[in-house]
């Protein structure tokens, strides 16, 4: 059984995405692409906060409440949190981070990495 992802996996995967930097803000690690935030490791680093369109976010939380949740202060923003110990494996974490990266990345990076963060063809 694969080990569940932890904060170090979040950091390693996020920083492997193109043009990503880590910056401490609000006393926590944040990850940015071309200066735009796409992931944070809040509180005890047991969950990761990522960009997610509100409609999609609400569906995720309803479908998998043990995995996804919305922090009160983020409710009005298009962000969702994923509990690291509820993720299936590192692959799922990679998909979540890459999807958030796509939402923040500028067009030049999306054009340079057209498949990054998109579902792979089966």
Stretch-by-stretch model annotation:
Residues 1-122:
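Charge-dense, helix-prone N-terminal extensions
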